[in-house]
Amino acid sequence: MILDKIIAQTKKDLDNRKNSNDFNKFLAQKRDFRDVKKALKATPDNPYRIIAEVKKASPSKGIIKEDFNPVEIAKEYIEVADAMSILTEPHFFQGSLEYLKEINKFSPIPLLRKDFIIDEFQIAEAYAAGADFILLIAKALDVSTLKRLYDFAKNTGLEVLFEIHDEEDLQKGLEVGADIIGFNHRNLETFEMDMDLSKKLIPKLPKNVIVVAESGINDFETVKKLSRNGVDAYLVGEHFMRQDNIKKAVLTLKGKTE
């Protein structure tokens, strides 16, 4: 399973980084946070919130954007998106924590460190690099580890996007107390899509949870359909990366024109 391979590589990388970096040094930095929940919660005047992703490649699709300039992409996103996701996993997604650090220098919108978080050290890195929220993947860890990392992130001031793929994951999210839950329509084992996942599981969530839809969102019709199911925000990467006019593509998914 691809997730197992990514986690194994992440552990290997972590061991190297932990030997040469001081965990507490990252957290000693004083910083402000951009308001993640305000950015992601749908409102009547902005019902379709977009988390636009800076993404060069993926295990299922290979290289998605050849002429990849993360800073230039981010400068377009900040004009039209509500938040931004930056892939920092280097081996399978060709991401980098350096992209996050650079984009943090100028972004007025909240930033997600999109990675395979399995250790407090990565959360400290995200904090120091300027992230406002991190991703925790329910499938990747047992519930006690998820709870420990969730609480650690919250205590540093970071928000958490808790990603689920099925009902078992949802139960983990409820146990952890997750207040921003992402429904990944793509099965991490088979890469197959289930666009009805959120429709099936949203009724089981507490009312105060912010709901994010991930994967397979390529047109405004899909956004409207998911919105009727109770989705607040839409995390979109590959679709935007394949467009010549990124700003126009974001606005189209928000149901707007330039």
Swiss-Prot record:
UniProt xrefs under InterPro entries: Aldolase_TIM (IPR013785), Indole-3-glycerol_P_synth (IPR045186), Indole-3-glycerol_P_synth_dom (IPR013798), Indole-3-GlycerolPSynthase_CS (IPR001468), RibuloseP-bd_barrel (IPR011060)
GO biological process: one example: L-tryptophan biosynthetic process
Domain of life, source organism: Bacteria
MF term (GO), any: phosphoribosylanthranilate isomerase activity
UniProt xrefs under PROSITE patterns: IGPS
Top EC class, one word: lyase
This protein's pathway: Amino-acid biosynthesis; L-tryptophan biosynthesis; L-tryptophan from chorismate: step 4/5
EC number: 4.1.1.48
Pfam families assigned: IGPS
Catalytic activity: 1-(2-carboxyphenylamino)-1-deoxy-D-ribulose 5-phosphate + H(+) = (1S,2R)-1-C-(indol-3-yl)glycerol 3-phosphate + CO2 + H2O
Cystine connections: none
Keywords per UniProt: Amino-acid biosynthesis, Aromatic amino acid biosynthesis, Decarboxylase, Lyase, Tryptophan biosynthesis
Alphabetized SUPFAM superfamilies for the sequence: Ribulose-phoshate binding barrel
Annotated family: Belongs to the TrpC family.
HAMAP family: IGPS_B
Listed name of the protein: Indole-3-glycerol phosphate synthase
Source species: Nautilia profundicola (strain ATCC BAA-1463 / DSM 18972 / AmH)
